[in-house]
Amino acid sequence: MKAQKYSKEGKLISEIELPSALFESKLSVASIYEAIKAENANLRSGNHATKTRSEVRGGGKKPWSQKGTGHARQGSTRAPHWVGGGTVHGPQKRDYSYKVSSKLKHKAVLSILNKKAQASAVKVIEDLDPKEYSTKSFDSIFKNMNLRNTGVIGFLVQGESDFVKKSVRNIPTVKYINSKRISCRDILYNRNLVITEAALNEMLTQYGATK
């Protein structure tokens, strides 16, 4: 599969062949589903909780006598049918985490890359090594690539680059992605995936080998 290659300024240079080990593996929708499901589940805190009648403060005294008042008998003001009472079958704290094997995630990443390449949504750019923070310069790069108003851009760079990360985070449609910590959500939920040459080589080392 082919992809467009851009200069550091965002100018189109040529069309290159993408590594087949990364972008031509067999598409597995099931693997993508399981990996995304696990990542979404792991983002949930699970700290929601309601109080039952035994946990709500107060209500120890019987509201009124059992007989002779004309009211229905009541044992506590914290019964579920009272205002301020406990909750029946309400949500309780739980662990939503869902684990998948590294082999499945590996397969999911390659499947997503394949899907992106088929949709011509993968762009390769020369390595960027800024020496200062500049949102304006990165905004200009994406404008030159004609990607600025096309939707979310996944910007995949090698390692943790503080200058790059802080420069692009003020651009609402750009998602910074560290090649050392790739998540399926990051590379899937975007309209275009822009990859630096160094990040592409690192991905080839990490995901290119058959598992």
UniProtKB/Swiss-Prot annotation:
Pfam families in alphabetical order: Ribosomal_L4
Keywords per UniProt: Ribonucleoprotein, Ribosomal protein, RNA-binding, rRNA-binding
Family matches, as InterPro entries: Ribosomal_uL4, Ribosomal_uL4-like, Ribosomal_uL4_dom_sf
UniProt keyword annotation of Cell membrane present: no
Gene Ontology molecular function, alphabetical: rRNA binding; structural constituent of ribosome
Gene Ontology cellular component list: ribonucleoprotein complex; ribosome
Region of interest (Disordered), ranges: 44-94
GO biological process: translation
Function: One of the primary rRNA binding proteins, this protein initially binds near the 5'-end of the 23S rRNA. It is important during the early stages of 50S assembly. It makes multiple contacts with different domains of the 23S rRNA in the assembled 50S subunit and ribosome.
Assembly and binders: Part of the 50S ribosomal subunit.
PANTHER family in alphabetical order: 50S RIBOSOMAL PROTEIN L4 (PTHR10746), LARGE RIBOSOMAL SUBUNIT PROTEIN UL4M (PTHR10746:SF6)
NCBIfam families, per database record: rplD_bact (TIGR03953)
UniProt similarity note: Belongs to the universal ribosomal protein uL4 family.
Name of the featured protein: Large ribosomal subunit protein uL4
Organism in which the protein naturally occurs: Leptospira borgpetersenii serovar Hardjo-bovis (strain JB197)
Gene behind the chain: rplD
